[in-house]
């Protein structure tokens, strides 16, 4: 059957809303750049043309650095591919692949928010649930020794799911039993999770001889998600796991 008008409109909204969010963010960022760049003021004091030139140069320079850091330098990527040097190729593509690594927990967090929306709940507590899930997974990842990877890695993932799930259970229970609004409760629990994680990383879970840096002990190799490339690229299987779960949620 032909797609319905409502279905087409929904698909357009799915594409349009994120695009508008990105454009709005870029515009707001550009305004902040202009308001905080001395060269722009100096240019307009000279002439309107000089000011507009300074506006373009400032925004282009800032966003050029932003996109190069997030996606890599296209020229360097092409040169690296033609050079055939494996290390140079890894270095050239590392910014883009690192962005995928960083995006992985955000994909999971977004799915958690989406599921709450589908259930009619406004879950602002995903940040705190992410903190507690990561803390639980980290503890299992470094505290358990001598386990094979086939057991240790899934166990760490399970610990993360349980940690985040239990933290999300608290506002759910409060809403069911007392009628407490999930928005208020989850916002407060976000701060509790943040402060608790900060205390743990500066105390019981702090890496020995870290020089006061709030960082956990090194996670056992058996608990780490497999990586596809050598150093300095950290790109790992978790990104494709996130995409797979996103497809399941959509389905």
What name fits each language-model region?
Residues 7, 87-88, 145-149, 230-233:
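Helix-boundary and loop/linker segments of multi-pass membrane transporters
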Residues 10, 14-18, 22, 94, ...:
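Residue-level signature of transmembrane alpha-helical entry/exit and packing/kink sites
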Residues 17-34, 109-113, 134, 138-140, ...:
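Hydrophobic core segments of alpha-helical transmembrane domains in multi-pass membrane transport
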Residues 1-14, 85-93:
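Cytosolic juxtamembrane amphipathic/interface segments immediately preceding
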Residues 33-38, 61-143, 157, 165-169, ...:
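Single transmembrane alpha-helix segments in multi-pass membrane proteins
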Residues 65, 74, 79-80, 186, ...:
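Transmembrane helix-bundle core of multi-pass membrane transporters
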Residues 28-81, 204-215:
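Interfacial/capping segments of alpha-helical transmembrane domains
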